Swiss-Prot record:
Belongs to the TRAFAC class TrmE-Era-EngA-EngB-Septin-like GTPase superfamily. EngB GTPase family. The keyword 4Fe-4S does not apply. The gene is engB. Mg(2+) binds at S36, T58. Coiled coil: none annotated. This is Probable GTP-binding protein EngB. Residues 21-195 form the EngB-type G domain.
């Protein structure tokens, strides 16, 4: 459970990342996948992560303290927004590569995918990148409330096939609107924190 959550800092530069031994779980996904809403649902604080009306605007890693230093959530910039210029895309790729490969605090990643849509090439590349570097990853399928019940199994199958899902990974379907499976996400955070 998350009893306390607070914003600490934002930074794109490794030299400004927090230098300690506190474990981190990173959240990443396409622009408008519902990442900020998911953070707010997890922390039960609708004002913690700002929900941007401008996709692709955030280019920083946002660090949130959880349970007074027990661990941190790290909110990564949304990717895949077409109107972001190439220089920003390159900066984003370099920052995330540096964070994922060299950040010793990182214990795992929640990769958010919209359950309504087939994963993009960016989604596939992100998942395969994390698998290549043996970074523990959980797939969080968002916007469950937007699906008909008849689509639940079909859409999950479509996503798993598209990204070449590894069966050892966890796949959770959530709704930020009605908090479906948020408790399951707490369990998976605990699992990731104990995995390395």
């Amino acid at each position: 459970m998350i009893k306390q959550a607070s914003f600490i800092t934002s930074s794109a530069n490794k030299s400004n990342w927090i230098d300690d031994d506190v474990s981190e779980i990173c959240l990443i996904g396409r622009s408008n996948v519902g990442k900020s809403s998911f953070i707010n649902s997890l922390t039960n604080n609708n004002k913690l992560a700002k929900i941007s009306n401008t996709p692709g605007k955030t280019r920083l890693l946002n660090f949130f303290e959880i349970n007074k230093g027990e661990y941190r959530l790290v909110d990564a910039p949304g990717y895949g927004y077409a109107k972001v210029d190439d220089n920003l895309k390159i900066q984003f790729a370099k920052m995330m590569e540096e964070y994922f490969i060299n950040r010793r605090n990182l214990k795992g990643v929640f990769l958010l995918l919209d359950l309504r849509h087939k994963p993009s090439n960016d989604d596939i590349m992100m998942y395969q990148f994390l698998k290549h570097y043996n970074i523990p990853v959980v797939i969080i399928g968002t916007k469950l409330d937007k699906l008909k019940k008849s689509e639940y199994v079909k859409n999950e199958k479509m996503i798993k096939e598209t990204i070449s899902f590894y069966q050892e990974d966890d796949f959770v379907k959530i709704s930020n609107l009605n908090k479906t499976n948020i408790i399951k996400c707490y369990e998976l955070i605990d699992k990731l924190l104990g995995s390395k």
